[in-house]
Structures are given as structure tokens and as C-alpha cells.
């Protein structure tokens, strides 16, 4: 369930989630069940979207009460969105310092979220900077696709 919500897709999302949980229930590497990925990138938050996520969340907990649920949210989802109240863990795909903004905005984003919701779990589900190993630079810059910038990016993310 990715990028765009379709009102007539609810039965399909529930069926796929059930198949996934039944198939992978005993897999040791599954820590959480993901409800959706960047679903608000091309869809507005509306009642249909919220109800579909509630149904998915309820189904996950019914079929596997031992694992939490999560959503991988795109950065522009409003921090007050009712969608954020549904999963057990809210995760974010953030590319500050690559597609937009500066690297230190990752820290600011998580600090702001945690200050507003100190009791909610949060995850960092996606981040990165594309690179071509053939591109090197003594003075790497955001967006230059050098492996040098990717190293700078990752060293600041992983401190």
C-alpha cells in the first residue's frame, strides 16, 4: 500500500495484509507490520484513507497481537494529522540534506516531533544520498552525486 490511496482498494489492501501476515507470521526478521509507505505523497488525508488505515491496523493486531504496526510517512505529512494516531510506531522517510534542506534538519524534525509527542514511538524509516562511485570530490556538495558527499551525509546521520 504505497503512495496513493484508492477508495475502491480497501478490500485489496486488507487481503494483501492478511496474506502477508499469514505467510510471514513466524519469520524471525519481522519486527513490525507496515501499514503503508508514503501514502500521503499523492493522496490527501481524508476519512476514507483514515478508515482504511484503522482497518489495516486492527487486522494486524487481530492476526498478530505480538507485533506493533508502523507507517512510513513522507516528510510533509502534518505533525497533527489524525493518521499519526493509528499505528503503534510512526516512521518517517526523510531526505533533509539531499532532496531538500540541510542535514541538521533531521535532528530538528525529530526534536520537534518528540517534544510534541513524548510518549509516541518514532522511527527513521528511509534516508540517503544517491552516489556514483566514479564521482569523487575534494569539496563535496549536496546534489553532486559524489561518493564523497554520500560519505559526509552518512557520517552525519550515523553519529
Locations of regions flagged by a protein language model:
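Short, hydrophobic/amphipathic alpha-helical packing segments
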Residues: 110, 150-155
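Conserved active-site aspartate in kinases
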Residues: 126
Amino acid at each position: 500500500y504505497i503512495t496513493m490511496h484508492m477508495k475502491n482498494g480497501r478490500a485489496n489492501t486488507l487481503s494483501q495484509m492478511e496474506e502477508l501476515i499469514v505467510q510471514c507470521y513466524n519469520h524471525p526478521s519481522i519486527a513490525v507490520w507496515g501499514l503503508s509507505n508514503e501514502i500521503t505523497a499523492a493522496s490527501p488525508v481524508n476519512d476514507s484513507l483514515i478508515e482504511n488505515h484503522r482497518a489495516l491496523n486492527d487486522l494486524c493486531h487481530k492476526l498478530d497481537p505480538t507485533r506493533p504496526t508502523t507507517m512510513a510517512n513522507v516528510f510533509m505529512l502534518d505533525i497533527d494529522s489524525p493518521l499519526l494516531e493509528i499505528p503503534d510506531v510512526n516512521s518517517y522517510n526523510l531526505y533533509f540534506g539531499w532532496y531538500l534542506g540541510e542535514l541538521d534538519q533531521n535532528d530538528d524534525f525529530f526534536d520537534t516531533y518528540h517534544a510534541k509527542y513524548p510518549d509516541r514511538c518514532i522511527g527513521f524509516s528511509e534516508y540517503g544520498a544517491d552516489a556514483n562511485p566514479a564521482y569523487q570530490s575534494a569539496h563535496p556538495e549536496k546534489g553532486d552525486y559524489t561518493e564523497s558527499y554520500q560519505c559526509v551525509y552518512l557520517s552525519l546521520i550515523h553519529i
